[in-house]
């Protein structure tokens, strides 16, 4: 059993994801998107769509990668209950391919944001958040230019009513404020689940908050443990 990290042209966080998973004792391997998943779905513990700049972010971030044939395999795997996580550019691919609602667009500050942010856990009942308690504040790095989550008012209300919001940007005390929102995301949303709670997308990078030598936080381990 293993976790597949999908490598698109322009991905640059696939090795990071593999290393982070291996660090917490989870077998992981990279798969080139043109090769597909083939028959390996039967032996999968999960799939990660990693960060980067797939296809140079032409058209829209994640838009071209969302049309890769492997996405059909990923959607089929999601329907079978296999965990799928989209991180940063992978989150954009997830939204563009319909794995989750909404879209990620240009930051309201119109610049690339690279910093460590605070996130408040909104729903601790999913595989991605069961390592935490609701209301817990964690620290995870971000690095994106198109991370502003947008969604229609009706869909946003559905996300809230269906408890699909995993994380919101907050301050160190857990307060949801405009100042704590690094990109202008609606409702300070940083991560959500899709039609299945085994499918999630988030802009922050949990793989960059897993190895202690990489920074001050290892809070990302709790998210990646969903694959264990």
Swiss-Prot record:
Keyword Electron transport carried by entry: no
Domain of life, per lineage: Archaea
Catalytic activity: N(2)-formyl-N(1)-(5-phospho-beta-D-ribosyl)glycinamide + L-glutamine + ATP + H2O = 2-formamido-N(1)-(5-O-phospho-beta-D-ribosyl)acetamidine + L-glutamate + ADP + phosphate + H(+); L-glutamine + H2O = L-glutamate + NH4(+)
Name this polypeptide is given: Phosphoribosylformylglycinamidine synthase subunit PurQ
Pathway(s) this gene product operates in, as recorded in its UniProt entry: Purine metabolism; IMP biosynthesis via de novo pathway; 5-amino-1-(5-phospho-D-ribosyl)imidazole from N(2)-formyl-N(1)-(5-phospho-D-ribosyl)glycinamide: step 1/2
Subunit structure: Part of the FGAM synthase complex composed of 1 PurL, 1 PurQ and 2 PurS subunits.
GO biological process: 'de novo' IMP biosynthetic process
Assigned GO CC terms: cytoplasm
Active-site residues, record numbering mapped to chain: 88, 205, 207
HAMAP family reported for this sequence: PurQ
Upper taxonomic lineage: Archaea, Methanobacteriati, Methanobacteriota, Stenosarchaea group, Halobacteria
